[in-house]
Amino acid sequence: MAEPFLSEYQHQPQTSNCTGAAAVQEELNPERPPGAEERVPEEDSRWQSRAFPQLGGRPGPEGEGSLESQPPPLQTQACPESSCLREGEKGQNGDDSSAGGDFPPPAEVEPTPEAELLAQPCHDSEASKLGAPAAGGEEEWGQQQRQLGKKKHRRRPSKKKRHWKPYYKLTWEEKKKFDEKQSLRASRIRAEMFAKGQPVAPYNTTQFLMDDHDQEEPDLKTGLYSKRAAAKSDDTSDDDFMEEGGEEDGGSDGMGGDGSEFLQRDFSETYERYHTESLQNMSKQELIKEYLELEKCLSRMEDENNRLRLESKRLGGDDARVRELELELDRLRAENLQLLTENELHRQQERAPLSKFGD
């Protein structure tokens, strides 16, 4: 019975030497009791070979061989030439594995070339899929793994790299140097553009803002001394001039006439703006009330003005006395100026002999 089994086994199609390694392998357990059937899932078509009927077993319900008479699974590793076949045939042709068949024990079978090909080791197994090398390429594979494990060389930053610093963190000296450098660069670029005939825009700087800011406040002390000195007559004395100069300079704020006018104008503008805003925010009743208050204030000021006019008329006789005092003051100033000129002449005459004696 071994010869028909081997002949049918040899006629099965062979795709490669590793077809048996890809399928699920399972060795027969020698301790399994005889006659035990191996249950195979019906859903998996790989385990049901309908194209090739089973040999050496009883016919099934559909005319095929029973599950007991399946050929032994192929081994993934190399087996001896005759031991694999004998172990696979034990469950089918042995006396203790067949339930109802009276088959004699198989005779010794000579190894065929097909059986030797099936018994060769598989080189395309999972080990080769994971990248395991063959026996001859172990060194090359190890070298590739070492190269992959090496870290890439990372270049260090250049030591000559300029560290940038924000402008607001610079010191005063650093800001000054930076501004000078930028101005020189802008001037150079403008000169190059002008030489090429291209239109040149003015240097973009904020200095004009500072100039406008400085011009907002008037020059309070420019030309005050010369104008006041030219307006003074020759009959004034040095003491009177110093006193008048102190009055012209203003109070403790040190601002002259132009400064006081500027402050007065600024105050009036601010007051008008505030008054306008307050009137716009008032309701109609509040505006009527404010108008009545202003009329009362106007009538009161008119009464005060009339009273002061009457008093000035009563004191009209004192105006002549005031004029006489003003004339007397002018005469005394003229005498004082004459005395000053005479004193200066006497000093010059006293210095002349001393200069001759020194020579």
Swiss-Prot record:
GO terms for cellular component: 7SK snRNP; cytoplasm; intracellular membrane-bounded organelle; nucleoplasm; nucleus. Residues 34-47, 84-93 have a biased composition (Basic and acidic residues). GO terms for biological process: activation of innate immune response; heart development; innate immune response; negative regulation of transcription by RNA polymerase II; negative regulation of transcription elongation by RNA polymerase II; negative regulation of viral transcription; positive regulation of signal transduction by p53 class mediator. Residues 283-349 form a coiled coil. Residues 236-251 have a biased composition (Acidic residues). Changing F208 to A/D/K: Partial loss of function. The modification Phosphothreonine is found at T236. The modification Phosphoserine is found at S97, S98, S233, S237, S252, S260. Induction: Up-regulated by HMBA (hexamethylene bisacetamide) (at protein level). Down-regulated by estrogen. Residues 202-205 are annotated as: Interaction with P-TEFb. Homooligomer and heterooligomer with HEXIM2; probably dimeric. Core component of the 7SK RNP complex, at least composed of 7SK RNA, LARP7, MEPCE, HEXIM1 (or HEXIM2) and P-TEFb (composed of CDK9 and CCNT1/cyclin-T1). Interacts with the N-CoR complex through NCOR1. Interacts with ESR1 and NR3C1. May interact with NF-kappa-B through RELA. Interacts with CCNT2; mediates formation of a tripartite complex with KPNA2. Part of the HDP-RNP complex composed of at least HEXIM1, PRKDC, XRCC5, XRCC6, paraspeckle proteins (SFPQ, NONO, PSPC1, RBM14, and MATR3) and NEAT1 non-coding RNA. Belongs to the HEXIM family. The coiled-coil domain mediates oligomerization. Transcriptional regulator which functions as a general RNA polymerase II transcription inhibitor. Core component of the 7SK RNP complex: in cooperation with 7SK snRNA sequesters P-TEFb in a large inactive 7SK snRNP complex preventing RNA polymerase II phosphorylation and subsequent transcriptional elongation. May also regulate NF-kappa-B, ESR1, NR3C1 and CIITA-dependent transcriptional activity. This is Protein HEXIM1. The lineage of its organism: Eukaryota, Metazoa, Chordata, Craniata, Vertebrata.
